[in-house]
From Swiss-Prot:
UniProt-recorded Gene Ontology molecular function terms: rRNA binding; structural constituent of ribosome
Record-stated family: Belongs to the universal ribosomal protein uL6 family.
Subunit (UniProt): Part of the 50S ribosomal subunit.
Keyword Ribosomal protein: yes
Name the record gives this protein: Large ribosomal subunit protein uL6
Amino acid sequence: MSRVGLKPVEIPEGVELKLDNNTVTVKGPKGELSRELHPDMKINIEDNVLTVERPSDHKEHRALHGTTRSLINNMVIGVSKGFEKSLEIIGVGYRAQKQGDKTVINAGYSHPVELEAIDGIEIEVPKNTQITVKGIDKELVGAIAANIRAIRPPEPYKGKGIRYTDEYVRRKEGKTAK
């Protein structure tokens, strides 16, 4: 049994948390996030420490308990520190560049792939083979990074494609001649 829901969430200096019925709004130095939570979960705030309580030990409530706590914790971390995902592009002629507010990726297709700017997400290209996705919403940062990776996922024979910086790509051996 997971005990994630029992851990308290520390609210750091400069982060303001507001509860309105089932909606939690977290405001911090990096921005503001709000999310509607399940009505069965009870949230208590005392001395800059937030705890989540469940009404019973039903399977559904146990699952929601940890999920609710993690969602709130991710919001608090997001508005105070932010989230970041790094990707690297491997392959001859594969590269990325910024053109105004667009990010253009050449990944071996007959056309370059253009990514529009999204509110609350910052896409940086420190080198033409690296992309960094930054933002305060963990879900959105992960989704955008996954969409970029999906443009050209790494292939197992030569390892060409777009991958996360810390991702390990399992390599396969090619066919051997008779």
